[in-house]
Amino acid sequence: MKFLERSLEVDHIHEPELEFAFGQKSAHPKDGLHLYGPHLKGKKAKEIRVGVIGTSEGIGHFRTWSRELQSIVKVPPPGKGEKANRLHLANFPGLEETFGISYDPDELSALSIPLADIDRATRVTNQHEAVDKVAKLYIERVNKHLHNEERAVDIWVLVLPEIVYERCRPNSKRTGLPTEKGDFAKKQKKRESLPLLAGIIDQSGETIFDDVPDFHRRIKADFLNIAPTQLIRETTLAPGAFLNTAGYPTRKTQDRATVAWNLGTGLYYKTQPRPPWRLSTIRPGVCYLGMVYKSLPNDPDGHACCAAQMFLNEGDGVVFRGANGPWKTGDYDYHLKAPAAKDLLKLVLDSYVDTHGEAPKELFIHGQTYFNDEEWAAFADAAPKGTNVVGVRIRPTGGEMKLFRDGDYPVLRGTALILDAQTAYIWTTGYVPQLDTYIGPETPNPLHVTVTRSKDAKPEIRDVLSDIMGLTKINYNSCNFNDGLPVTVRFARMVGDVLTMGSAIKGEKKQPFKFYI
């Protein structure tokens, strides 16, 4: 008997490098920022204008933490069972030393909200109403400041007491919590349908049911036309101030140096015109698009919103809002009709031309589902001659494929299993020699990548995998070596979450990505 045997090719995609000040390169954001500084480093420190909203205690914690950011924040000594040299951790050199920005902790635009008011709002019987009331406490304080104060703010930091995190998320368990009666019944989750009383009864207050009861999403939506925001929990800033009965912090947080790196990166990215680092390996004239779909909550017609995230070699992203419509075609499938697909891609291409003076040579559209014939024909038709539009499906896997190697650590990050000319598995997480560790709880799972469509010639699968590796390194919401997902896919759900909020309707058609994260 003869058995057909097929040998699969295993390859390794090199770690992409990032570019920092003076054109210097490094694979790790922390190394590059420490040694060279951000990509567009100024000759002198830039003063940023920071506003902070929270309880008086929360504002105090942020001021204390802000003073710590002015100098070195050291990695704590290794604990029991930890390596002496933990290369994935690094001391934070200080905000001005690292990023070339500064702010005076005593000159913050500080807006205080009594904890009792927040607590009372979180206990309103109807959860939609409770989240709305808590969000309004923060939003109205900012709007009052903007109306009365001349001092502009570059970024608003919202310091959240733990009760907001615990009680103001979807499906938050408030069992046993004494509740306060509000304007709506406890179980109401959508607008009342009263067609016979339309125009007689005022139902304007029921717009809260156009939103998901999620404080984070609501704040991001409401601030789209104000300024970028950074949400941070009091327990992150001062874990030692919140202890359990045994004398330990109530929640485990990252070490202080890592928190400093992440907070500093967020402050820089959200207040400066360009991100702190950019990819040095991206080919010129290439643009990446992440498709975003999300069902609209409580929409009577079952419509969904669509949007596109565009990322360039500069690293920064722009979100383009498309039309709402009947885009959902299955449990997890979304497809645009031809006019909407054409309009959305034209919006993206016009923006690219405005920035670069010419259309891109290649436009990669990343999605988690396949593209149907109608929408793909519209995408191809919207692109000018000379622009190759390429559709790439990127799907996380859950254990269907495992690859093992000898030794104590799993496969290297960047390992690729080539199935054919258009299909491969790529391990974007795994052992990183530079860090001498694998940061993860179990054997890493790969991404399944398929080049599904192409207007002109299909690109080499290794080029597609290399691009995906690079796009795992431009999450400016943290300062990690890499993420497991490319930024085009990783933040699709988060962007969709914000765009589907009824309070986001007034947002612009085109907005910087930094407003959404």
Swiss-Prot record:
Which SUPFAM superfamilies does the protein's record reference?
A: Ribonuclease H-like
Q: What InterPro entries does its record include?
A: RNaseH-like_sf, RNaseH_sf
Task: List the keywords (alphabetical).
Answer: Plasmid
Gene Ontology molecular function: nucleic acid binding
Q: What is this protein called?
A: Uncharacterized protein y4cC
Species of the source: Sinorhizobium fredii (strain NBRC 101917 / NGR234)
